[in-house]
Regions:
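Bacterial signal peptide processing site
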Residues: 19-21
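Short helix-capping/linker turns of helical repeat alpha-solenoids
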Residues: 50-53, 66-68, 86-89, 102-104, ...
């Protein structure tokens, strides 16, 4: 009986080990397949971008800026985004603006960033609105203006950016419009994460102070 038990245990251990090995092999294959797809996408975008395709240049710049399907490379992000921006891509204008705004691969230049974000907005890129709002709220490269910040945040809020919504709520809170601030803080889209945590905290503070 003891001998049979030992044999069964050995079989189970062997099966478990084989299962783990198979899973590791599958994970490696899956990772390799994903990497191949990512490499192929970047390769295809690069080929199109070199031929002057504006959309490909824009996407390639974004890929290098945010590390999408490739490693972050701010030099290449700037190179391809500038090419696309020169051809009128509003998204690319915003992306070049982000590089200057954050100082990614270049020296921070708020005036240059402001111009690029403004051009991006004029071209219809909604993402640039958030940055313009931030610049006016904090007085980065422009004279601080909560009215102007609220103006841009209001427009950007329609895109569903919860960070923008929180920033807008803080401006209303500072202005004493607690009802509007509460309304904005409550719009968390049902999320409970690091992005919405400041909204819940601000909401709790207002309720605790009897300003809800």
């Amino acid at each position: 009986m003891k001998k049979k038990y030992i044999i069964v245990m050995l079989i189970l251990i062997l099966m478990f080990s084989c299962g783990k090995k198979k899973k590791r092999n599958n994970d490696v294959k899956s990772k390799t397949t994903i990497e191949q797809k990512e490499n192929n996408r970047i390769k295809e975008l690069t080929e199109k971008a070199r031929k002057g395709d504006v959309e490909a240049q824009t996407q390639l710049g974004e890929a290098y800026l945010h590390g999408i399907d490739t490693k972050i490379n701010y030099k290449k992000a700037m190179e391809w985004s500038k090419k696309a921006a020169a051809k009128g891509s509003s998204r690319a204008m915003t992306n070049v603006g982000i590089l200057y705004f954050e100082g990614f691969g270049v020296k921070k230049d708020y005036k240059q960033a402001y111009k690029l974000f403004s051009d991006g907005v004029d071209g219809g890129d909604m993402k640039a609105l958030k940055y313009l709002g931030t610049m006016y709220e904090k007085g980065l490269g422009v004279e601080k203006s909560f009215d102007s910040a609220a103006f841009y945040y209001e427009m950007a809020d329609s895109s569903g950016d919860l960070t923008v919504r929180y920033n807008l709520g803080k401006i209303y809170e500072m202005a004493g419009d607690y009802a509007k601030a509460v309304e904005l803080y409550q719009k968390t889209d049902g999320r409970m994460d690091q992005v919405t945590a400041p909204m819940y905290e601000a909401l709790g503070d207002l309720y605790a102070a009897g300003k809800g």
